[in-house]
From Swiss-Prot:
Record keyword Transport present: no
Descriptive protein name: Bifunctional protein HldE
Organism whose genome encodes this protein: Azorhizobium caulinodans (strain ATCC 43989 / DSM 5975 / JCM 20966 / LMG 6465 / NBRC 14845 / NCIMB 13405 / ORS 571)
Binding site for ATP: 198-201
Keyword Nucleotide-binding carried by entry: yes
Originating gene: hldE
Job of this protein: Catalyzes the ADP transfer from ATP to D-glycero-beta-D-manno-heptose 1-phosphate, yielding ADP-D-glycero-beta-D-manno-heptose.
Length: 479
């Protein structure tokens, strides 16, 4: 996703804004009223709202088709100039209406302290002509897009009709839709792949708390039932919680970082999520990438973008901290590590097995697997999984012992356990570039092969060492 590859365009549709920052110094109180006197220092203009999502997506290397509503005014020109600094953003689908001013939020700052915010906006619903123009623009952008983002700030652009048209256009092309919501309930977003409320938005939509991970999962489930899709809750210092329609839940802790400003951090996370999905990452891995991007954003002052180089470096640091070579990690941590490897352009290979008594046949399989790419992930059946497959007398070595042996193999970079009878859910979460199994399987028999190939990966069947198996070793030892 962060490697130098061509990404599918991202259509960002929503409420675009101008964020103006006036900075200066304060050393006294006005004699006219009990307010500080700011000595003007500088001003800067940056994209805000949906435009900030577009800027962040472009900074991460994605082509962007921006759909929004601006006026015929100086603020619109300033926004266009600010967006022009990010190569890859197309404004061809923007709608201009002289009757409506461009939304502008002016923040007056002294150092890192915000003194006041001044909003210049009209939040009335769009009239029929504006709505028709927005629908046409959205449909045209979605026709070219690989991912659709609806950035809803409740400023009038994303009406029921515009949302419905966007959902229909995306469904017709089988394009995923991510929504950053601003409504009190999420029914209007029916058809979305994923909705990403923050804690306040989730509470308003469900009336449920999110203090604990279990609370957040229950509230996310209630929200997901409203529109029929997955829910990612951004929980500030508590990290992120992903609830999926099949009942799976993923909790990602927040990365420890000094927080300077939360302005626009949600936009940054949303953009990183969309870019990651456009790059072929799984949703689970994309959540980890979005979490890392948000951590970088809050360390910056004001509405800011996170660049591809910054995010790649952060992911590399995270991967090194989580998993030294051969480490046994959770599925969630494996997602983060694999995402970091892919961000570096590394080719990730996956194989799996019980690996109870390691023999030359296993070694050959692992060596041939490692030769297919740059990093090898080995998924091990847990003890319970092995017993279900091979009977109560197996495994001979427990899962921790087997994982340690695997991790000591110099060709193995990461070890992850799975408790199911097959590694399908792990494959779906990691989405490796190459899936390797022995040549005793037919391609249609390999679990997860369809998932990997549908994502642009490949299945490789490697030769086995004749006469070498754990079962034969066990039988020989018992005679």
């Amino acid at each position: 996703m962060l490697a130098e590859t061509q990404l599918a365009p991202i259509a960002v549709i929503g409420d675009v804004m101008v964020d103006r920052y006036i900075t200066g110094s304060v050393s006294r109180i006005s004699p006219e009223a009990p307010v500080p006197v700011l000595v003007h220092g500088a001003e800067r203009i940056v994209p805000g709202g949906a435009a900030n999502v577009a800027a962040n997506a472009a900074a991460l290397g994605a082509p962007v088709l921006l759909v929004g509503l601006v006026g015929e005014d100086e603020a619109a020109s300033q926004l266009a100039d600010a967006l022009a600094t990010y190569p890859g953003i197309s404004l061809a689908h923007m709608v201009v209406d002289a009757k409506r001013p461009t939304i502008t939020k002016t923040r007056v700052m002294s150092g890192r302290q915000q003194i006041v915010r001044i909003d210049a906006e009209v939040t009335r619903a769009c009239d029929a002509a504006e709505e028709a123009a927005l629908i046409g623009a959205a449909e045209a952008a979605i026709a070219k897009a690989g991912v659709v983002v609806l950035s809803d700030y409740a400023k009038g652009v994303l009406s029921d009709a515009v949302i419905a048209a966007a959902m229909a256009a995306a469904k017709a092309r089988n394009v995923p839709v991510i929504v950053d919501p601003k409504r009190r309930t999420f029914e209007a977003y029916r058809g979305a792949t994923l909705v990403t409320p923050n804690r306040r938005e989730l509470a308003e939509a469900t009336g449920l708390p999110d203090e604990t991970d279990a609370d957040a999962a229950r509230a996310a489930e209630a929200a997901g039932r409203q529109f029929g899709g997955d829910v990612l809750v951004t929980r500030a210092e508590k990290g992120m919680t992903l609830w999926r329609q099949d009942g799976r839940v993923l909790h990602v802790p927040a990365e420890a970082r000094e927080v300077f400003d939360v302005s626009g951090a949600g936009d940054t996370a949303l953009a990183a999520l969309a870019v990651s999905l456009a790059g072929g990452q799984s949703l689970e891995a994309s959540v980890g990438i979005a979490n890392a991007a948000a951590a970088l954003a809050v360390a910056k002052l004001g509405t800011a973008v996170v660049t591809r180089a910054e995010l790649r470096a952060a992911l590399e640091r995270t991967a090194a901290q989580i998993a030294p070579p051969g480490a046994l990690v959770s599925r969630e941590d494996a997602c983060a590590v694999v995402a970091a490897w892919k961000a570096q352009g590394l080719r990730v290979v996956f194989t799996n097995g019980c690996f109870d008594l390691v023999h030359p046949g296993h070694v050959s399989l692992l060596e041939q697997s490692a030769a297919q790419g740059d990093r090898l992930v080995v998924a091990l059946n847990t003890d319970a999984s092995v017993r279900r497959l091979k009977g109560p007398s197996r495994p001979l070595q427990d899962e921790q012992a087997r994982a340690r042996v695997m991790g000591a193999m110099r060709c193995v970079d990461l070890v992850v356990l799975f408790d199911e009878e097959t590694p399908l859910e792990t494959i779906k979460a990691l989405l490796p570039d190459v899936l390797v199994k022995g040549a005793d399987y037919a391609p249609h028999e390999v679990v997860g092969a369809d998932v990997v190939t549908a994502n642009g990966g490949e299945l490789v069947l490697v030769d086995l060492v004749a006469g070498k198996s754990t079962s034969s070793l066990v039988a020989k030892a018992r005679t």
